Amino acid sequence: MGSKVVAVSEMVNQIGHKFEPGNWMTLDQDRINSFADCTEDHQFIHVDEEAAAQTPFGGTIAHGLLTLSSLVKLCEDSSLYPENIVMGINYGFNKVRFLAPVRAGKRVRAHVEIQNVEPKDEKRYVVTLAIT
């Protein structure tokens, strides 16, 4: 697996393409604890294994925003990567939902589809992805 490097303008030809899922990423307790420290979100369902075991989740769960922010690496592993870019910027998110908790120690990966490539000028594009 891994991303294929292409010219941004070539990504237009990939609209509607569903890529093979990328590599698995484990959201282990150390990663969850580090995210809790960075965001100062130490809610017990994320960091207290004993207390979280008494909840309907049966153990600690990853922060939804940790799962969301992991998409940068997960998408990089599974889809096209534009060549010769200076930077990529998150423009925003549409219809983000957290449909199920991710228990500590579980693995996640991304299924990516290019939905749209909109040129803004000769050097800037907005690329819209559907990610599940």
Question: Where are the regions that the model predicts?
Answer:
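Catalytic strand-loop segment that frames the active site of acyl-thioester-processing enzymes
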Residues: 2-62
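Hydrophobic beta-strand-centered segment that forms part of the acyl-chain substrate-binding groove
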Residues: 56-59, 69-111
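Core FKBP-type peptidyl-prolyl cis-trans isomerase
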Residues: 65-68, 126
